[in-house]
Amino acid sequence: DVWDAFNQLQTYKDEIGDLFNTNAALVVSDGFTARVGSLTANAERMLPWRTIANEDDRPRLQMELETVVRGFFKPELFLDYVRHFVLFEQDGDHIAKKVAGYHQFHAVREAVRATVIAAQDVGKSVLEVHEERATYGKEVQPGSRKAGVVWHTPGSGKSITMACHAG
């Protein structure tokens, strides 16, 4: 099962840790079920990747592994992920690598788009947003300086979301 794959990678990490020095994210799968997390994540922080490009294209009957391959590893999304959604946190002598979950990834991408639109001067298109927005609620007005709020349930990673948005 998927947790056998997770345990196998933990063994590799312990025995040949240098192999993982440049690892951005860890994907474990049994060929159907798949989870994405960081190299230092425990099993509870290994989460499914539920979408391809945004919340509107969430596959219903697709294997989780296919969703990870088509969504998480889509080149332009993966490069954005590696650049903006991999974080490090020091806890004493230990450095933990943390990565955003799919919900954080898509929420931050939408929040950044909304922020860019709300921050631009009306009549000037210095900042252009080339991707179609996935809108939640009212449209963001250019120049309004009002970009909205990202809402998460308790324990779902608001700190990571805000760090990625600010970063």
Model-inferred region functions:
Residues 1-167:
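ATP-dependent helicase/translocase motor core
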